[in-house]
């Protein structure tokens, strides 16, 4: 064994061994308990970043630990390979998205191998290959036949200059990112999957997910947004149709003083024919894309349509306004306004001088003061005719019942959740498998024409999708009749909604899933990824699992038993102000810093001498230029050091602050482990350990070893507090470094201890542990070695610490045998100099003894 720890020499050797031996390849084995450990698959952007490394290290630690417990562990990896960034990169680098993507996959695969992750590479998949997306296309056609897929027009961002649809992130300040033309809202036909048909189940089954973070479950509950209320129909004077609104507060209905409709509502369109002000307002609304998050903060605007609706209970005429806070795609595109008891309605009514009518009493029973704001709390009704004096629940039911009896109301359960629009007007995605015949009939692509293959040899102009630009691509025949293919592609969330299931049978040719394999491995035992995926991906992931269950492919209700959301990786961020006042962000690697005595950064400059402003720790990002390249760190310290730091620096679900000093600390620790094993093995063979012949000191050290095994096992297995597990191993290492190594049993004990340490560290730092296990003459490869088991007998304390007090003041702490009697403890206490001093010449009036803990002598 060489004396120095040289990761650059051992890591590549161990990785080659794993490759050649196919160590992590698994198949179904009914005789073994399975464990499916999955990290969210990466987008092949070109290089791994520290967020990836953290995510995949956590997964690898768990997978290796479970493997050492003797389970059949599946840990696969693949590539979420479709998506918009590839199109931009292809234009920039004068290539096509496919070669750019495949090059990135090859590069990043090497980076993953360099970090020593134990993946079953035989199951690797890339979602951009026809072998993968053909089954997604087939499944979509099945969903269409089941009535779970439909087409309807929906608003998109449209650049009139480029004649193309833009994603929300391509709209900068209302203009096209490429040509700066003002973006319009345009209605185009798009495909939707009926996720709303599963809304109740998606909501209710959250209660089954005991091992998912509450934050994620709450976000999904709010996103699904189930509410109970009443749908109310209003007659409108001089208008051919009625208006329907939905409210969750029918108790406030007698305070409804106006209605508001979306700018795109047919009533507003009709009114605009003779109202130029309204027409201009509708135009303005059409071209403002409003995300729901911005709705709350934006200025509320509206125009009176001139139409009057009739309040069904009071018979009063109330105005109908067009307002920018009502969205056509939500509900009916019309809302009832109760400005006395809804703050948004109140602000709008105050701005435009509309009637505000209070109908709910304040908590103290007085009439509410509406001079500053609405009263939004529930309470007792007044000013409401026959409903006066009713509380919220009674009023809700009474008004709902009356409206229902009159035929103008209906109790309804509503959802915030909208159906999933899966059409994208981009090129680099899976083609949607639908065709249109010459007579306008729309139908699914027949099975014998699947997959609909996306051509990869294309020229990107950065504007139009190549399959939209080439009229020949869309032409096909179905049942001998000419037809046109759909030129939209799937939302890339489609591919990531079912990949976890395809990993169980990536080569399966007969269908989407081999149910036997899928049901052996599924559900996933632990799924690891960022909390930013809480609603979109993790909701579609759950939805797809239920769709596959209802298609008879899987036999479970939920895709993953446990979800672990790892924290973000933060790093120092610095900038200097340029000549034009712009911020130039400087990589922390290039910052020369001065620190105070507490280690805080007080001054910084770069190599060019710019004074740098230090903005603290923030998420590693391109925009702040504060990402640290994992590859550079691995080349400098070795993969094991980077992995150990990642797991030690912070609990897995909290943010991690990147500190190179911490990385150096992790590296020093591994050097210490190496050195101790080197010194131990240099002394030659070791005798067998005889636990019955150990001295008190040897027993105490062995107790520490086995207590550490018990703690680390609990920390990794049950608590998943990996940082405290590592801390416990480090503490044990400090004791081992000071332990005597001269006697035969000293060395036998050291052998047992080091074999335990190396196995406990193996999930974190597998390369060094693989090597040290061989040096310690461990049986077989460490990859197949069992996890160490704590010896209960070794952990039993044979002595205990007793605190000795005289008149309640601590005078000594003594070590006594566990089974010592009170007399023996008193006798031993009397031998202590300080205790004897305070007992000299006085009478012991009372003795308080708590066995094994406390002896208090009361003297007078």
Curated annotation (Swiss-Prot):
Motif ('KMSKS' region): 619-623
Record-listed ATP binding positions: 622
Any single Pfam family the record assigns to this protein: tRNA-synt_1g
Primary location class: cytoplasm
BP terms from Gene Ontology: leucyl-tRNA aminoacylation
EC number(s) recorded for this UniProt protein: 6.1.1.4
Membership in a protein family: Belongs to the class-I aminoacyl-tRNA synthetase family.
Reaction equations catalysed: tRNA(Leu) + L-leucine + ATP = L-leucyl-tRNA(Leu) + AMP + diphosphate
Protein name: Leucine--tRNA ligase
Location in or out of the cell: Cytoplasm
Primary enzyme class: ligase
GO molecular function, one term: leucine-tRNA ligase activity
Protein's gene: leuS
Lineage of origin: Bacteria, Pseudomonadati, Pseudomonadota, Gammaproteobacteria, Enterobacterales
InterPro entries, per the entry: aa-tRNA-synth_I_CS, aa-tRNA-synth_Ia, Leu-tRNA-ligase, Leu_tRNA-synth_edit, M/V/L/I-tRNA-synth_anticd-bd, Methionyl/Leucyl_tRNA_Synth, Rossmann-like_a/b/a_fold, tRNAsynth_Ia_anticodon-bd
GO CC annotations on file: cytosol
Record's keyword terms, sorted: Aminoacyl-tRNA synthetase, ATP-binding, Cytoplasm, Ligase, Nucleotide-binding, Protein biosynthesis
């Amino acid at each position: 064994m060489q004396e120095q720890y040289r990761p650059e020499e051992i890591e590549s050797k161990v990785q080659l061994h794993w490759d050649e031996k196919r160590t992590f390849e698994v198949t179904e084995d009914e005789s073994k308990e399975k464990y499916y450990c999955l990290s969210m698959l990466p987008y092949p952007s070109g290089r791994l970043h520290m967020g990836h490394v953290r995510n995949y290290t956590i997964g690898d630690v768990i997978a290796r630990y479970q493997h050492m417990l003797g389970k059949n562990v599946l840990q696969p990896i693949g590539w979420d390979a479709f998506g918009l960034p590839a199109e931009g990169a292809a234009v920039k680098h004068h290539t096509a998205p496919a070669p750019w993507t495949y090059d990135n996959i090859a590069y990043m695969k090497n980076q993953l191998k360099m970090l020593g992750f134990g993946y079953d590479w035989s199951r690797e998949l890339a979602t951009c290959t026809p072998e993968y997306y053909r089954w997604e296309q087939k499944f979509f056609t099945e969903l269409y036949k089941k009535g779970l897929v439909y087409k309807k027009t929906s608003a998109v961002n449209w650049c009139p200059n480029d004649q193309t649809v833009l994603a929300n992130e391509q709209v900068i300040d209302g203009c096209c990112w490429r040509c700066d033309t003002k973006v319009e809202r345009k209605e185009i036909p798009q495909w939707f999957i009926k996720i709303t048909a599963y809304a109740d189940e998606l909501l209710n089954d959250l209660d089954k997910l005991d091992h998912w973070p509450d934050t994620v479950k709450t976000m999904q509950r709010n996103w699904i947004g189930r509410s109970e209320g009443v749908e109310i129909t209003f007659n409108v004077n001089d208008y051919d149709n009625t208006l329907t609104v939905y409210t969750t507060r029918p108790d406030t209905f007698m305070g409804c003083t106006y209605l508001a409709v979306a700018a795109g509502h047919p009533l507003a369109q009709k009114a605009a024919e003779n109202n130029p002000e309204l027409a201009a307002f509708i135009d303005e609304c059409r071209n403002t894309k409003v995300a729901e998050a911005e709705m709350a903060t934006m200025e509320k605007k509206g125009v009176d349509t001139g139409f009057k609706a009739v309040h069904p209970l009071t018979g009063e005429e109330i105005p109908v306004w067009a307002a920018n806070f009502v969205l056509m795609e939500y509900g009916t595109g019309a809302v009832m306004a109760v400005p006395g008891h809804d703050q948004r309605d109140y602000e709008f009514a105050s701005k435009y001088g509309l009637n505000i009518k209070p109908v709910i009493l304040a908590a103290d029973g007085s009439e509410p003061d509406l001079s500053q704001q609405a009263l939004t709390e529930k309470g007792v009704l007044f000013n409401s005719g026959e409903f006066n004096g009713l509380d919220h629940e009674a009023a809700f039911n009474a008004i709902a019942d009356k409206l229902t009896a009159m035929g103008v109301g209906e109790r309804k359960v509503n959802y915030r959740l909208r159906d999933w629009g899966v059409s994208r007007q981009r090129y680099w995605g899976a083609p949607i498998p639908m065709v249109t015949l010459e007579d306008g009939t729309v139908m699914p692509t027949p099975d014998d024409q699947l997959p609909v293959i996306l051509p990869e040899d294309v020229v990107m102009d950065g504007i139009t999708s190549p399959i939209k630009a080439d009229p020949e691509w869309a032409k096909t025949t179905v049942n001998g009749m000419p037809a046109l293919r759909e030129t939209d592609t799937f939302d890339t969330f489609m591919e990531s909604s079912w990949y976890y299931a395809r990993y169980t049978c990536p080569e399966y040719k007969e269908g989407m899933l081999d149910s036997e394999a899928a049901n052996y491995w599924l559900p996933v035992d632990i799924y690891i990824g960022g909390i930013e995926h809480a609603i979109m991906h993790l909701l579609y992931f759950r939805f797809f699992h239920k769709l596959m269950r209802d298609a008879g492919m899987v036999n479970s209700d939920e895709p993953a038993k446990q979800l672990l959301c790892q924290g973000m990786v933060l790093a120092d961020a610095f900038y200097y102000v340029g000549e034009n006042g712009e911020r130039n962000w400087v990589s922390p690697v290039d910052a020369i810093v001065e620190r105070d005595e507490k280690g805080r950064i007080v001054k910084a400059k770069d190599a060019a001498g710019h004074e740098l402003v230090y903005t603290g720790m923030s998420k590693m990002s391109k925009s702040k230029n504060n990402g640290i390249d994992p590859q550079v760190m691995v080349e400098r310290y070795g993969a094991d050091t980077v992995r150990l730091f990642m797991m030690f620096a912070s609990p897995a679900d909290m943010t991690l602050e990147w500190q190179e000093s911490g990385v150096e600390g992790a590296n020093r620790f591994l050097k210490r482990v190496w050195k101790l094993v080197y010194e131990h093995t240099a002394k030659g063979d070791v005798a067998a350990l005889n636990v019955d012949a150990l001295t008190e000191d040897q027993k105490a050290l062995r107790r520490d070893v086995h207590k550490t095994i018990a703690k680390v096992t609990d920390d990794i297995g049950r608590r998943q507090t990996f940082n405290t597990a590592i801390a416990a191993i480090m503490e044990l290492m400090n004791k081992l470094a000071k332990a005597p190594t001269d006697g035969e049993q000293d060395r036998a004990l050291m052998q047992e201890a080091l074999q335990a340490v190396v196995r406990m560290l193996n999930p974190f730092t597998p390369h060094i542990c693989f090597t040290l296990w061989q040096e310690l003459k461990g049986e077989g490869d460490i990859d197949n070695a069992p996890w160490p088991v704590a010896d209960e007998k070794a952990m039993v304390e044979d002595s205990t610490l007793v605190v000795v007090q005289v008149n309640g003041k601590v005078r000594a702490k003594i070590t006594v045998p566990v089974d010592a009697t009170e007399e023996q403890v008193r006798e031993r206490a009397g031998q202590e100099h300080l205790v004897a001093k305070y007992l000299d010449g006085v009478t012991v009036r009372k003795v308080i003894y708590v066995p094994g803990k406390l002896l208090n002598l009361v003297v007078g």
